[in-house]
Curated annotation (Swiss-Prot):
GO cellular component: cytosol; endoplasmic reticulum; Golgi cis cisterna; Golgi membrane; nuclear envelope; trans-Golgi network
Classification lineage: Eukaryota, Metazoa, Chordata, Craniata, Vertebrata
One Pfam family recorded for the sequence: Got1
Transmembrane segments: 10-30, 32-52, 69-89, 93-113
Any one GO BP annotation for this protein: retrograde transport, endosome to Golgi
Gene name of the record: Golt1a
Purpose: May be involved in fusion of ER-derived transport vesicles with the Golgi complex.
Subcellular location: Golgi apparatus membrane
InterPro entries the UniProt entry points to: Got1, Vesicle_transpt_Got1/SFT2
Lumenal side: 31, 90-92
Ranges facing Cytoplasmic side: 1-9, 53-68, 114-133
Mode of membrane association: Multi-pass membrane protein
Protein name: Vesicle transport protein GOT1A
Family: Belongs to the GOT1 family.
PANTHER family for the chain: CGI-141-RELATED/LIPASE CONTAINING PROTEIN (PTHR21493), VESICLE TRANSPORT PROTEIN GOT1A (PTHR21493:SF245)
Length: 133
């Protein structure tokens, strides 16, 4: 069984608050203060979850430098109160950094259709027509 330290639990909470502030900042028409606060919380929480050394090693791998520069550059642009441009740069950097994780996430979401309760829920949401045409 995986043991989770108290610092990692705090990191999950801080990362969750960071994602919340980022989404709330986007909902409020790219409020630069909320986006900047969310970015700082997200990066702090990530470093608490996986550790400073692993965070640094993840972001500064040779094949991920382009994504890292766009992501951290976007964070800097948001901190300089250019939220729309900063979030666009961050989004591109995020996709570049985490593109290796997307197949795993989509595979997990695809397996959610095999869970008994969720499969019936998805069928009800889909409607009575099971035809693909």
């Amino acid at each position: 069984m995986i043991s989770i330290t108290e610092w990692q639990k705090i990191g999950v909470g801080i990362t969750g608050f960071g994602v919340f502030f980022i989404l709330f900042g986007i909902l409020l028409y790219f409020d630069s203060v909320l986006l900047a606060f969310g970015n700082l919380l997200f990066l702090t929480g990530l470093s608490l979850i996986i550790g400073l050394r692993r965070t640094f090693a993840f972001f500064f791998q040779r094949h991920k430098l382009k994504g890292t520069s766009f992501f951290l550059g976007g964070v800097a642009i948001v901190l300089l109160r250019w939220p729309l441009l900063g979030m666009l740069l961050e989004a591109y950097g995020f996709i570049s950094l985490f593109k290796g994780f997307f197949p795993v996430v989509f595979g997990f979401l695809g397996s959610a259709f095999n869970i008994p309760f969720l499969s019936t829920l998805f069928q009800k949401l889909q409607g009575s027509s099971s035809s693909m045409v």
